Amino acid sequence: STPKPSSAASDVYKRQTNPFAFGEFEVFEGRNSYNVTKANIQNYFRELVLDLDAASLAFYFAEFAEYYCQENNDEREMLKLLYQSFRALENSRYSKELVRAVFELKAITINGEGPQVFACMHCHAKEDLCFFSVKRGGIFCRTCAKEVQGMYISDSTRYTMQYIISTPVARLYSFTVSEEVLRELKMIMKEYMAYYVHHDFKSLSIFG
């Protein structure tokens, strides 16, 4: 008969395979998958499972990372982003909508698909940047915007996007924004994701 693990060993295994457990894992490659042989967990993110919205967003972030990451690639930046985003979801200082927008913008930037928000896409000017075009993948100055379809955004929203794109992941969640900036940021990311990320994330069915 097949030997069964003891209840204590089973409890350890369950804790190590908690969906939000972060730590160091030792694995060996089986025929069709990797098998965990040892784990040293630093953070279980237990608070996430107590909040349905936070948990559904955390699952979305993990699903997003799984979609973008490639096996045997160096995906440390995405892993760092997941970790910091989970921490932000547990912090009541940050709205979940802001955490989602920050995660999405940083994740697509890590993947090389982020927008250009530091200079006009047409004339390369760095002043009077106020018009964002999803289809063109970036920002335009007031003069060049006359020939482009898109939306006007505030300086504060542009600064926020520049900060998210350029700041190391470890310092990413260190700010809050006004309702107006959050509204614009959410609108941009909703349209940008719909245009560039062609995937139906199942976990979003809960959070919306």
Where are these predicted regions, by residue range?
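Single conserved hydrophobic/aromatic residue that forms the stacking wall/gate
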Residues: 1-5, 9, 13
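Internal, conserved structured core segments that host functional sites
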Residues: 50-110
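Short nucleic-acid-contacting surface segments enriched for D/E, G, S/T with interspersed K/R
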Residues: 11-23
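Flexible glycine-rich surface loops and low-complexity tracts that mediate binding to linear polymers
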Residues: 20-32
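C-terminal, charged interaction/regulatory segments at domain termini
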Residues: 92, 96-208
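OB-fold/S1-family single-stranded nucleic acid-binding modules
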Residues: 33-44
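Generic beta-strand structural signal
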Residues: 21-23, 63, 128
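A short, structural micro-pattern
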Residues: 17-19, 33, 135
